[in-house]
Amino acid sequence: MFTEDRELIDRSFKFLLASRALRSVALILVNLSLSLYLKALGYGLIFIGIVYFFIVLFNVLITFTLGTIGDRIGYARTLLIAEFLPLIALFGLAISENVRVIIASAMLGGITGSPGGIRGAFSPGMTSYIASNWPDERERVEKLSKIYATASFAAIGGSFLLATHGYLSHYFGTINSFRILFGISFILTLGSLISLSFLKETKRPKKTTRLMKKESFSYSLRVMIPNIINGSGTGIAFPLLPLWFELMYRISASYVGAVFTVAYAFTAAGSYFSGAFLNAKNIRAITVSSLARILQGLMLIAIAFTPLLFLSVILYSIRSFIAGIGTPMRSAINVRGISGEDYGTASAVQGIFTRSSQLTSGLSGYLMSEALDLPLVTGGFLQVAGALAFYWLIRSWEKKHNF
């Protein structure tokens, strides 16, 4: 997988895009479906929230393990190893409706319930792979924007498949229809795994520390602190968001899929806009990405108090467009001050704190059982606070380093 031929590395990028597209369809489908599936099986909100707590907890361990070995064995190999986990998980979900198998599979596959359009883009080693092979920040943002736009556009396929659930239910029943969809996700993830086997990457610099350099850790702290705040909000607001739409507006799983289909189209447009326009102009990335996150939080709060479904869909779609703009820039900023030999470990450590903060997903079901709007309002306020902290910490680093 290692090569010094830049042309080969650049040409292999298309296989990463293909992988992210297939992975996005599969994981968006299962992330949107899991809470609805558990509810259809008869489990309550508090139980579902607790399930997500353990899913996130296990995902923390996986993120750290795969991230740290990536600095030593290469990020393309890390991506390949990481893809085996959801493949096994989706097989388990497809063949059994036993709750123990469902929980174990969801934990192994990292099915955290996040319904964001770029969910399929992320796996351990992805950001590190981009940072390692394209050191120029503008080029990184361009590559990340293409990945996020591709994943978001492909996510429409995942939400569309969920929208077919109502049709399938007429023939196979509610539960078996979910399992059929999980089987389709398994096949798509297998395609993603095959695509990743064609990736090429530049040879890794020799690792000189057991964990990471002091300057890399110092910069990572500036990323981790706001990510803890934001991750707490994400954990509270998003795992049960598809279920929130179902309960708030009394719509079926098929209609939930339609809602997110619209939102993912807007996320894809935002990611394309970020890479094609904002990255080409003299715009400060930290300002744009922080403002985008603030607006995301405020709009989440507004959605919580929206009584009409069509208004909620409009607000969530606009929020998704804004998320598409900010995410590629934030991803590039996260590795800006990291040494080349520490990309994987730094991303893993940052991911640990972000994922750990999302253990608040255990509160999501409890808050929703008390009042439907509580998870969204709480999560929205935390996103705003996290964005303000991110801007202050990164901007102070930029000033110190005349960036």
Where are these regions (language model features)?
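Helix-loop boundary and gating motifs at the non-cytosolic
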Residues: 2-60, 219-260
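Hydrophobic core of transmembrane alpha-helices in multi-pass small-molecule transporters
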Residues: 21, 89, 99-121, 311-325
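Central cavity-lining transmembrane alpha-helices of secondary-active solute carriers
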Residues: 50-68, 261-274
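Conserved MFS/SLC helix-loop-helix module at the cytosolic interface between two early adjacent transmembrane helices
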Residues: 61-98
